[in-house]
């Protein structure tokens, strides 16, 4: 876990314009005033392990959630899926999804965890592959903020054009627009992309929060264009919520996992406009959780409030979309809050609830599996499941034109993420990389400005 040792560093008045190189120590100079600055110290070694945990936790949760993806979406419109799953369905036979042609998942005959052993390889999916691509682009271009051209060129290079390309609806529309020469953020404009309210941006941008530890405002600035590549309005705000959660995961206050998760969630809630349906979904879901009712009852209440009764301005049902908008950002955001609140920071419990909650169940599970996996690291994940896992990842299952025929390792992926974060800490956050102690020093505020 990250250690939050607070270091007080004295800023000295520069008395001359000498060009001496600064020492590799915890000292930085200020030319205007003498004041103490509080720094948060983060071990780069520990952070690399946590990035490994992000990729591993996300992979476990993604593939487990895929077993029940679109099995249960409610009973409105032409497609009806019967009663939602409950905790009693864990370990029982999987039921067919809306596109399963009457057959259960080929990943597992039962609703259960999906693992890859040490001799196997994790496959990429749409919940991991665009994030992998964005990390690759940041690393390759040696930039913290990608340009519209870099995003478009990256998509066109790494996403397959004609065969199965594992893109969801807004991502596919944005990809089509890119082929026509249109650049982000116009690819996510409501005027050009009718799917701007869908879940796609959440699939692709949470990772930016990890590149700006403890600094969600910088993480959001980095993620702004990738988010707007495929989303606007409420879907954009929801994506910013997840980016904020990921950035705040770097703060280890010494509290329990449940306390940390709920504090992070309450802080992230502030990015949602109070009058918006995402904010009201958050408040309603949290209220039901705090009332002590079972998670299934909260999930059912969310379904009736937002899909049946269309309250708080959530009117997806009235649009008569395929599967009643089962892939919309809103209802899946609400479903993700159920597993977040009731999972209480427990990785296995959170994945189980997310898998059973309904709708696009692999997405919330991947989101929280990656978040909690980051918080507890590789060793924490292995301890939770009492086993070892594969460290290999095949990005070419869904994408193309990456090195080594697409076979990567979590060690290499986390090392790249560490280098990307190095640049953000130095250039965007204004922190210090202490080479001798292998630490980041993240500035908080001048001590004399603390209230």
Kindly give the residue locations of the regions a language model identified.
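C-terminal motif of bacterial Sec signal peptides marking the signal peptidase cleavage site
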Residues: 15-17
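Bacterial lipoprotein signal-peptidase II cleavage site
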Residues: 19-26
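Catalytic phosphate/nucleotide-handling subdomain of diverse soluble enzymes
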Residues: 60, 64, 71-92, 231-234, ...
């Amino acid at each position: 876990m990250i250690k939050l040792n607070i270091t007080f560093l004295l800023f000295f008045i520069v008395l001359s314009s000498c060009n001496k190189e600064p020492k590799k120590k915890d000292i930085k100079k200020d030319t205007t005033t003498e004041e103490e600055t509080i720094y948060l110290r983060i071990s780069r070694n520990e952070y690399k392990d946590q990035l490994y945990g992000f990729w591993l936790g996300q992979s476990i949760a993604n593939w487990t959630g895929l077993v029940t993806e679109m099995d249960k979406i409610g009973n409105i419109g032409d497609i009806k899926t019967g009663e939602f799953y409950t905790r009693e369905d864990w370990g029982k036979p999987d039921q067919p999804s809306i596109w399963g042609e009457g057959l259960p998942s080929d990943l597992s005959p039962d609703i259960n965890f999906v693992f890859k052993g040490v001799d196997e390889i994790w496959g990429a999916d749409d919940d991991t592959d665009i994030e992998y691509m964005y990390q690759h682009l940041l690393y390759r271009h040696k930039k913290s903020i990608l340009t519209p051209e870099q995003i478009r060129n990256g998509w066109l290079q790494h996403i397959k054009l004609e065969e199965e390309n594992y893109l969801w609806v807004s991502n596919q529309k944005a990809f089509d627009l890119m082929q026509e020469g249109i650049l982000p953020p116009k690819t996510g404009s409501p005027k050009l992309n009718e799917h701007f309210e869908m879940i796609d941006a959440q699939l692709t941008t949470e990772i930016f929060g990890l590149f700006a530890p403890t600094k969600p405002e910088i993480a959001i600035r980095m993620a702004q264009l990738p988010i707007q590549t495929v989303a606007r309005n409420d879907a954009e705000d929801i994506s910013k919520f997840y980016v904020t959660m990921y950035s705040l995961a770097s703060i280890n206050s010494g509290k329990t996992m449940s306390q940390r998760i709920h504090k992070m969630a309450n802080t992230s809630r502030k990015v949602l406009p109070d009058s918006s349906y995402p904010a009201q979904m958050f408040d309603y879901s949290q209220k039901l959780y705090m009332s002590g009712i079972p998670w299934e009852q909260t999930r059912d209440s969310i379904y009736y409030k937002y899909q049946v009764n269309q309250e708080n301005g959530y009117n997806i049902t009235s649009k008569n979309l395929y599967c009643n908008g089962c892939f919309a950002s809103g209802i899946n955001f609400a479903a993700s809050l159920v597993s977040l609140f009731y999972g209480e920071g427990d990785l296995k419990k959170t994945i189980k609830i997310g898998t059973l909650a309904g709708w696009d169940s692999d997405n919330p599970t991947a989101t929280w599996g990656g978040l909690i996996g980051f918080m507890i690291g590789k060793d924490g994940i292995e301890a939770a499941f009492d086993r070892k896992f594969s460290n290999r990842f095949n990005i070419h299952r869904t994408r193309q034109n990456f090195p080594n025929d697409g076979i990567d390792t979590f060690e290499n992926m986390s090392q790249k993420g560490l280098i990307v974060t190095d640049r953000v800490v130095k250039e965007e956050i204004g922190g210090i990389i202490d080479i001798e102690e292998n630490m980041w020093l993240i500035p908080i505020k001048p001590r004399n400005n603390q209230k």
